């Protein structure tokens, strides 16, 4: 009897669509000028002081180089896949997934601004939003129908691991070793945005699912 083999990995369409937008945005950024677009549409605390709120969103689709965009895309593919499936692959579920991604990204930028209220460094990249997807994915690591509790081993382990990674990134930045960070291109890593996005994803995933009646 002939059996159909399941693919090893099948990304849901909202994740594929999100990655398509990110890659298309960086292709356009590369064509126009990576630094020029980043300086114009990237996020900084200064942009908030100037009452420019668009960079809170536009920065999530810009990157500093191909290595940067590919590393973030891999994170989104890995952690966004289970999250998108939990939201559901219909129109409402996709809207919930995209909204969750954007909210985590915006809050990650605001977290960075809170840590650097007078800073003028420009932040670009999907890593803050991807961190939110990672946190949400940790709450799906359970055999039951609900979400894993905050105090469960998978949730605590992933949060601890991500905290440790970002403390190392912070130390590397202090020591001037940013060039050793994969995908950074030698630029400082906005580790504060990573942690803020992770916290946002961890806290907001459950309430959003409940609001959408998909808990």
Which stretches of residues belong to each language-model region?
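A detector for small-residue-rich transmembrane helices and their helix-helix packing motifs
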Residues: 1-215
């Amino acid at each position: 009897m002939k059996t159909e083999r399941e693919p090893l990995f099948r990304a849901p369409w909202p994740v594929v669509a999100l990655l398509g937008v990110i890659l298309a945005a960086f292709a356009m950024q590369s064509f126009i000028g990576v630094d020029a677009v980043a300086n114009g549409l990237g996020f900084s605390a200064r942009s908030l002081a100037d009452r420019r709120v668009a960079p809170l969103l536009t920065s999530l689709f810009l990157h500093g180089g191909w290595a940067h965009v590919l590393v973030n895309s891999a994170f989104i593919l890995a952690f966004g896949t289970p999250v998108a499936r939990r939201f559901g692959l219909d129109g409402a579920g996709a809207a919930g997934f995209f909204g969750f991604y954007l909210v985590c990204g915006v809050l990650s930028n605001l977290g960075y601004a809170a840590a650097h209220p007078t800073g003028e460094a420009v932040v670009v990249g999907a890593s803050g939003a991807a961190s939110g997807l990672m946190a949400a994915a940790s709450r799906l690591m359970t055999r039951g129908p609900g979400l894993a509790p905050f105090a469960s081993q998978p949730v605590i382990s992933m949060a601890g691991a991500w905290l440790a990674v970002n403390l190392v990134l912070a130390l590397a930045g202090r020591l001037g070793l940013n060039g050793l960070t994969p995908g950074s291109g030698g630029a400082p890593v906005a580790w504060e945005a990573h942690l803020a996005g992770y916290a946002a994803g961890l806290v907001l995933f459950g309430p959003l699912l409940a609001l959408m009646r998909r808990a």
